[in-house]
Regions:
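Generic short beta-strand segments
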Residues: 1-11, 100, 150, 207
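Long amphipathic alpha-helical scaffold regions
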Residues: 6, 198-227
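Short, exposed beta-strand/loop patches in secreted or surface proteins that constitute
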Residues: 44, 83-91, 124-138
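Extracellular beta-strand-rich solenoid/capping regions of secreted or surface-exposed proteins
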Residues: 3-43, 52-71, 78-95, 163-176, ...
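Generic recognition of long tandem-repeat/solenoid scaffolds
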Residues: 93-101, 137-150
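Extended Gly/Ser/Thr-rich low-complexity repeat segments
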Residues: 74-76, 103-131, 149-169, 175
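All-beta strand scaffolds that present successive hydrophobic residues in beta-strands
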Residues: 43-46, 67-72, 155-159, 178-182, ...
């Protein structure tokens, strides 16, 4: 499967530490999960079902649709395109992270373009994102990174996406009258919803939120629209 093959390639480190440079480019081949190209006057009644994606792909494709609705769909990944961990130690010029929720076993090749830190003091994002310049894998799924952090962040959760942009979870392109009701996105290897050259998109009760037990969801923007 091409989606799993791409995931394996990226996670091996073959695309480097910023994989979007290799795959977030015009005409890069990609897999579509649910493809509704050309559909008209249709409603998808998901009733809370989860579309669990196996490999890196575009979850839902709405190309040239008209009067199309999706109700009650959740989108997530079988293996998340990000890893979460806990900061276990902070020194003057480095810090150590144990990845208790790794996408797979962490190696020196695993791509980490940045890290987001959940600051328990404010119950929100720490003010800065950090590049992840690792020094060593010091134990299974335990990595020492270069960088300076305040000591109080010991015990904080970090979310480490394995790429920035790739395909969106839902892509709406050259479509008219699209409605998303109670749609949830728990994770994606890029943006949540992207609309391009599209008229009249209605989103009711959209939830771009972490899956249960996680602090972070999509790797980049929740939504992004362009004319």
């Amino acid at each position: 499967d091409k989606a799993v093959e791409l995931e394996n390639t990226v996670m091996s480190g073959a695309y480097g530490q910023n994989p979007e440079r290799k795959m977030f480019i015009p005409y890069h081949d990609y897999v579509r999960g649910l493809d509704f190209t050309g559909a008209k006057n249709a409603t998808i009644m998901a009733n809370g079902a989860t579309l669990l994606l196996d490999g890196w792909m575009e979850g839902v494709s709405l190309e040239k649709t008209n009067n199309f609705k999706i109700k009650g769909l959740c989108i997530d990944f079988l293996r998340k395109p990000m890893s979460e961990g806990i900061i276990t130690d902070i020194q003057n010029d480095n810090y150590t992270v144990y990845f208790d929720k790794p996408a797979r076993e962490i190696t020196m090749g695993t791509p980490f373009p940045r890290v987001n830190i959940w600051d328990n003091k404010i119950d929100g994002h720490y003010r800065d994102t950090h590049g992840m310049n690792r020094e060593a894998v010091v134990a299974p799924n335990t990595v020492r990174f270069k960088g300076q952090l305040p000591k109080y962040l010991v015990g904080a959760t970090i979310g480490a996406p394995h790429t920035f942009h790739y395909r969106p979870a839902i892509f709406i392109h050259e479509s008219v009258n699209t409605t998303l009701d109670n749609v949830t996105i728990n994770g994606n290897c890029g943006m949540g919803i992207v609309g391009f050259h599209t008229n009249t998109v209605t989103m009711n009760h959209l939830n771009v939120v972490p899956a249960k037990g996680f602090k972070f969801s999509t790797n980049t923007d929740a939504t992004h629209f362009a004319a």
